[in-house]
A protein has these predicted regions:
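NAD(P)H-binding glycine-rich loop region in Rossmannoid oxidoreductase-like domains
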Residues: 36-76
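Conserved Rossmann-fold NAD(P)-dependent oxidoreductase catalytic core, especially the SDR/UDP-sugar
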Residues: 82-120
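NAD(P)-dependent short-chain dehydrogenase/reductase
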Residues: 134-187
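A recurrent short beta-strand within the Rossmann-like NAD(P)-dependent oxidoreductase core
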Residues: 150, 179-180, 184, 199, ...
Length: 281
């Protein structure tokens, strides 16, 4: 199988290349290509590679930046996925793309949220990710969108790293500064390696939208405390009162044979894989 990957130098894409070595023929867009490319340039590149699957991981995912720069967000998060879809349609490739749990921002419903929920995202990033889903599926009904949660990894293997829950907690502990979390903020958080493991079978999913990540029945206050305890560190947590529910119901993916650990199980696995099961003590 020939797979063309966008965002291959990013947090997830670099780990896809690392974990999938030898599993398929992996091709990437040149670094910086998508930042300047128009639709015709993308189409020509896809035609040259002739992939079986386009795995579109590239995005502009800084929600604050997207809020302040909506045109940049629209190009990266709506236009480019649509151009990918048209190129896939013309070449006969399957398109599998990341969406985000941020499409659920603004949801009033409690508990795990299904893919069928009527949505009205409260931030620009979530609005654009939802629009991309809708517009791409109109052009390419067999495209697959995976709504992923906040992901994390620990530094290692010379792979790029970015801010995430365990690293944020570690920095706060080292600096002696408090971190803020709400007892009314609910979301799953996933170990990126598990996401990438499940991403390979997801290439064969029927077209549509799928929630794709770990469950979590704990608030972010409880989750942060659990992560800190597993790390063996002491962190001061300031409890705030703002409300958000991004918890995703994973039953649709589970019905296709794709399952995830809970948020807490996933972090315990992460520590085992880095030989840190006893924490950092």
């Amino acid at each position: 199988m020939k797979i063309l990957i966008s965002g291959s130098s990013g947090f997830v894409g670099s780990r896809v290349l690392h974990q999938w070595q030898g599993r398929a023929e992996l091709f990437t867009f040149p670094r910086g290509f998508l930042a300047a490319a128009d639709e015709s340039a993308i189409r020509r590149f896809v035609e040259t590679v002739q992939p079986d699957v386009i795995l579109h991981l590239a995005a502009l995912s800084d929600t604050g930046y997207c809020q302040q720069h909506p045109e940049d967000s629209r190009r990266a998060n709506v236009d480019v996925p649509l151009w990918m879809a048209r190129a896939a349609a013309e070449t006969g490739a399957k398109l599998v793309a990341f969406s985000s749990d941020q499409v659920y921002s603004g949801a009033a419903q409690e508990g795990p949220l299904p893919e069928t929920l009527s949505l009205s995202p409260s931030n620009i990033y979530g609005q654009h990710k939802l629009e991309a889903e809708q517009r791409v599926l109109e052009v390419l009904p067999d495209a697959v969108f995976l709504r992923v949660p906040w992901m994390y990894d620990l530094p290692g293997y010379q792979l790029p790293i970015r801010g995430n829950l365990p690293l944020n907690l570690l920095r706060a502990a080292l600096r002696g500064t408090p971190v803020q979390f709400s007892a009314h903020d609910w979301r799953g958080i996933s170990f990126v390696r598990e996401v990438i493991e499940n991403l390979y079978p997801a290439l064969s999913l029927p077209g549509g939208v799928y929630n794709f990540g770990s469950s979590n029945d704990r608030s972010m206050v409880e989750t942060a405390r659990q992560f800190a305890e597993l790390l063996g560190i002491s962190v001061a947590i300031e409890i705030t009162d703002w409300h958000r529910n991004l918890r995703m119901d994973g039953c649709k993916a589970t019905a296709q044979g794709i399952t995830f650990c809970s948020t807490q199980e996933g972090f315990a696995r992460c520590l085992r894989e880095y030989n840190l099961s006893g924490g950092l003590r």
